Swiss-Prot record:
Cofactor(s) needed: heme b
Similarity remark: Belongs to the cytochrome b family.
Name the record gives this protein: Cytochrome b
Subcellular location: Mitochondrion inner membrane
Pfam families: Cytochrom_B_C, Cytochrome_B
Residues passing through the membrane, by range: 33-53, 77-98, 113-133, 178-198, 226-246, 288-308, 320-340, 347-367
First-listed, main subcellular location of the protein, grouped into a coarse class: mitochondrion
Residues that hold heme b b566 according to the record: 97, 196
Domain of life from the UniProt record: Eukaryota
InterPro entries in alphabetical order: Cyt_b/b6_C, Cyt_b/b6_C_sf, Cyt_b/b6_N, Cytb/b6-like_sf, Cytochrome_b, Cytochrome_b_C_euk/bac, Cytochrome_b_N_euk/bac, Di-haem_cyt_TM
Amino acid sequence: MTNLRKTHPLMKIISQSFIDLPAPSNISAWWNFGSLLGICLIIQIVTGLFLAMHYTSDTSTAFSSVAHICRDVNHGWLIRNIHANGASMFFMCLFLHVGRGVYYGSYLFKETWNIGVILLLTVMATAFVGYVLPWGQMSFWGATVITNLLSAIPYIGTTLVEWIWGGFSVDKATLTRFFAFHFILPFIIMALVMVHLLFLHETGSNNPSGINSNADKIPFHPYYTIKDILGLILMTTVLLTLAMFSPDLLGDPDNFTPANPLNTPPHIKPEWYFLFAYAILRSIPNKLGGVLALLTSILVLLIIPLLHTSTQRGLMFRPISQTLFWILTANLLTLTWIGGQPVEEPFIIIGQLASILYFTLIIILLPLAGVFENRMLEPKFP
């Protein structure tokens, strides 16, 4: 009798992707984040679905419907806290996943990398529209400030903003359409994830050494299924600890106040995972320039494969590039800190210097380091 797992049209696809998939024998814990992101996505879709059953996307009832979920719905407080903090875990895993890709040269799988960047942008869009839904002060003003940035586009800007708003300000129409976007985007993300995996399985996984591992492959199950389960346990422990003990740790206190168009909060700032981009946006005094810098800060990831100058794939054996990579990491943490600070000295100048350093490291210094390291490795005969 033939094995159903290997012959059934649907089960065969699952088997080839998660059971019999040949994987490098030496991939480290940095390769766990892909599966963790998949789990995060499932958690967010499931909790989001239950929240959508009780939420109302109308300006007069949105805030109180969220309060109703937390007070009156069975375990509603838990579902909401898991969903809100699940977004933070999602971005934490995303940043580590992208960082791994940059460090180990995984971006040389160009199709997988480009789909990944599109996924990052889509997840950011989903998180942004989702943050507007509770209709608190920071939800309302965050939506107003960020959508207003589109007015910097020459000629069509103002029309575009009013078209997105569905009126002359952020109001009922905006909230309703943002709820629709927030509902549909995770399913688009799911489809993109499948394409991401499709391209990855065309080439097979990269590994820490950066060299071809075809000669030494092991089956995904049981080796990496067990390893992924360990990652899952650790992540869910952190998530549940956060959701149960300090669910509001990463949120903004202003969002406990219902949206009021007549009262501006003292400091308008997004959630922690957008602060680095927000700092880059604010570091340029010109509106259009800031918007372009904001976009470029993410889209620069698309040109990283073109900036690869080294003869080696990853940074495993390249100490100069490694140093620059960790400076870039520290720089991103600095930008995250600056994004949460008020617009005053010395934060303005620190933000501007960190923004310049961010682009300089990626576009100039890392490619130059690659060339320099190549020269150092050239054999020198007497």
